[in-house]
Amino acid sequence: MDQQKIPQATAKRLPLYYRFIQNLSLSGKQRVSSAELSEAVKVDSATIRRDFSYFGALGKKGYGYNVNYLLSFFRETLDQDDITRVALIGVGNLGTAFLHYNFTKNNNTKIEMAFDVSEEKVGTEIGGIPVYHLDELEERLSNDIQVAILTVPATVAQAVADRLAETSVHGILNFTPARLNVSENIRIHHIDLAVELQTLVYFLKNYPQ
C-alpha cells in the first residue's frame, strides 16, 4: 500500500512498534504475537493487526510475526539507515536537556547544532553540540538540516519559525505554547507539555482505572 494512504494515527505508532521489536531481537526472541505486542506497547491487538495490515502480510495466523522480518521491514519503512540531522533553537533548560540526551536511542537522529542569544552559551559546546548565535541561523543551516526543534520563548516562536521557513528545514518540533503559521511545505508537530499534563490530570480524575 502507498504509505501516503496510511492513517496518521498508524504512522505515529510505527516508531513505538519498531523500538519494542528492536528489544525483542536483542533478547534473541524469534517470533511474537499481536497479543504480546499489545501488552508491551499498550495498544490493543486488533489495532496492531489493522496497523500491520496496511503493509500487507507481515505475519501468519497461528504463528504470529517473525521478529527479524519485522525488524528489517520497519527499519526500511522508517528509513533507519538514513541519518536525520537536526538543529535546536533555544538553549534553555529544556533545550539543554535535549542536547545532553541527543536521541541516544535513535541512531538515525542527531542534533548537530544549536542556536541561542545568550552570551554565556554562544560559542560553547553542550553535550558535544556547538551553540551558535541566533543571528547566524540562515548562514549555519546547511541543506543537510531538515528538522528543527523549537524550545524558545513563545513570544519569539513565530519569528523564528518564519526564518526557518526560508531555510532547508521541512519539519519543526514545536515545544512552545505558540501555534505557528508557516507555509504548507513545512510540517509542524506541537508538543505543549502543560497541555499534556492537564490532559493527564483530567483523565486521572474523570476516568479512574
UniProtKB/Swiss-Prot annotation:
GO MF terms held by the record: DNA binding; DNA-binding transcription factor activity
Residues within the DNA-binding region(s): 16-55
Pfam families assigned to the protein according to its UniProt record, in alphabetical order: CoA_binding, Put_DNA-bind_N
Domain of life: Bacteria
Single GO BP term: negative regulation of DNA-templated transcription
Xref: SMART domains: CoA_binding
Keyword NAD: yes
UniProt GO cellular component terms: cytoplasm
Location in the cell: Cytoplasm
Function: Modulates transcription in response to changes in cellular NADH/NAD(+) redox state.
Family: Belongs to the transcriptional regulatory Rex family.
Complex and partners: Homodimer.
Stated name of the protein: Redox-sensing transcriptional repressor Rex
Organism, as annotated: Bacillus cereus (strain ATCC 14579 / DSM 31 / CCUG 7414 / JCM 2152 / NBRC 15305 / NCIMB 9373 / NCTC 2599 / NRRL B-3711)
